[in-house]
Amino acid sequence: MLDSYQRKIDYMRISITDRCHFQCAYCKSDHPRKLKHQDILSYEQLLLIVDQAIQLGINKFKITGGEPTIRKDYLFFIKELKKREVEVTLTTNGSLFTKKDLDFLKKIGIDGINFSIDTLDLKEYFLLTRQNCLETVLD
């Protein structure tokens, strides 16, 4: 698949949730509108879209949100993507990860994890995110 400039399109960004437990100054709306549960695509629906995208030549999938680790069974979804022998990366704030989650992602062969860490200064981190968990993220 090519864009209007004849560049190959080979990746798709999938936002699996619009929710996030951070309140980042640069991201948060003053009047957030969250989708109702029934309005969010199920993993089965997302996988049908993924299968169609693969047929069109997409071979890289970037999983984002909101904060994707908030969504129940996000690890199942990533595992299902990896079964399709495609490249999968995850973007997260890292605050909800456990060692078990990281071990699982390594075991199934995730291709990359992008951690959103805006500063290494504890005070600045809190001012940006309204969360006091930088040390947890860095661990």
Model-derived regions, located:
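A generic structural signal for short
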Residues: M1-L2, M12, H37-Q38, G65-G66, ...
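Radical SAM/AdoMet-radical enzyme domain recognition
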Residues: Y43, L47-I63, I70-D139
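Flexible, active-site-adjacent loop/turn segments at secondary-structure boundaries
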Residues: D3, R7, K123-F126
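Canonical Radical SAM [4Fe-4S] cluster-binding loop centered on the CxxxCxxC motif
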Residues: S4-E44, L56
